[in-house]
């Protein structure tokens, strides 16, 4: 045990005690224009690369939410292609551009993401730019009987790829939301009651060029919740809980039922060109989960 008072050396001496050493007198240049630029030195580096960049970048953003906007925290992946005769890209330009957009009051929309990806490619002097942005989207949910409201959230994402040589852009959007599912088999064979579980519905859709006015977050949310046994709620009083319990019993769903019903809704949405749907149920009477998936391309039919 240490004894008090303790006589301490200066902070500089303490750092030396624990291994700090003074900087050496270097011989390499400290001015940027005199430094060797390894990334841009031309040479045959064997292969061109599809994507080079940074991921897991946390940043505050403002998103478009219907007729309003919403502030949230997003996770970015930013990348560009890389030609064969360049060793790498200047990655600092990626976060530099993100900070520039943020300081200019950027509102995230499908159109502004396409412009962002195009500018990434141009800054890097590459032909392709890509980005993925993920964030929690918050929305208000009212209880079914009392009308009491609270906030819900869904995980959403947008992925953009732009080719500056062909001027082509692809855009896909996705959403994951939790729902209630009640087992049809349990309801059918039991004298009373039925087991239910929390289902995780994940949807991803490729959008057509004419999808500018498509409120994709709300449409995907509705596709999942309207086909579930019951949606989730942040606030439920006893009259609400009774309503939700009975609603689930009236609408039993297997995971297979969920993905087929959601697929039917997405198929009817003209702005969607192709889609992926997955439902995963955390089973209450098993240790394992139940899953079902479907991938469908309307243009390939």
UniProtKB/Swiss-Prot annotation:
Cross-referenced HAMAP family? GTP_cyclohydrol_B (MF_01527_B)
UniProt catalytic activity: GTP + H2O = 7,8-dihydroneopterin 3'-triphosphate + formate + H(+)
Name the site position(s) for May be catalytically important: 183
Q: What is this protein called?
A: GTP cyclohydrolase FolE2
Function recorded in the entry: Converts GTP to 7,8-dihydroneopterin triphosphate.
- Gene3D superfamilies named among the record's database cross-references: Urate Oxidase
Q: Name one Pfam family in it.
A: GCHY-1
Any idea of its EC number?
3.5.4.16
The superkingdom of the source organism is: Bacteria
One GO term under biological process is: tetrahydrofolate biosynthetic process
Organism for this UniProt entry: Exiguobacterium sibiricum (strain DSM 17290 / CCUG 55495 / CIP 109462 / JCM 13490 / 255-15)
MF (Gene Ontology):
GTP cyclohydrolase I activity
Family membership noted in the UniProt record: Belongs to the GTP cyclohydrolase IV family.
Q: Which UniProt keywords apply?
A: Hydrolase
What pathway is this protein a component of?
Cofactor biosynthesis; 7,8-dihydroneopterin triphosphate biosynthesis; 7,8-dihydroneopterin triphosphate from GTP: step 1/1
